[in-house]
Amino acid sequence: TRCLRDIRLHQVIQFLFFEQWQRVRDACHSRRIAIMGDLPIFVAHDSADVWARRELFRLDPDGTPTVVAGVPPDYFSATGQLWGNPHYRWDLIERSGYAWWIERCRSVLDQVDRVRIDHFRGFEGSWEIPRGATTAMVGEWVKGPGAQLFEVMQCALGVDQLPFVAENLGVITPEVEALREHFRL
């Protein structure tokens, strides 16, 4: 019952926020101001996304990530960055027609006009670090969904030009550039 009260409280707070946000957005649009949001590729382990859709993430039966996200050593950090976000089960997400990703993007686009994709390079390939590692030096690159996700997204959103802006930090390979250029992000 305490959880139910907490859930109800957050539902009311979110309802009020979104109602107020819509008024802000309408005021911006009336002045021809577009709003840009931010969408990180990975979600937090303790997020509602992971809680509600555990099967879409690389977790063991008790819900602990089997591998986590980060980036290898680079000019920002000699030991890389160990973010700790669970990796996706891209195979299951693909089988669903990328439904979860489509819904995620639709949700953010209900709130903003354009979206900066944080760690865009992860859609081409992302750094996967074994559970328990203390640095990101021990990871490996794993293939992401690439162009297929963005093609499906274009169809689902009914647009020729996706309203996304790709972040280009980190290890940007020719394949990442080709993906970004192909979709003009």
Give the ranges of each region predicted by the language model:
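Alpha-amylase-like alpha-glycosidases and glucanotransferases acting on alpha-linked glucans and related
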Residues: 1-18, 42-185
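Conserved, well-ordered alpha-helix/loop/beta-strand core segments that scaffold catalytic motifs
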Residues: 15-42
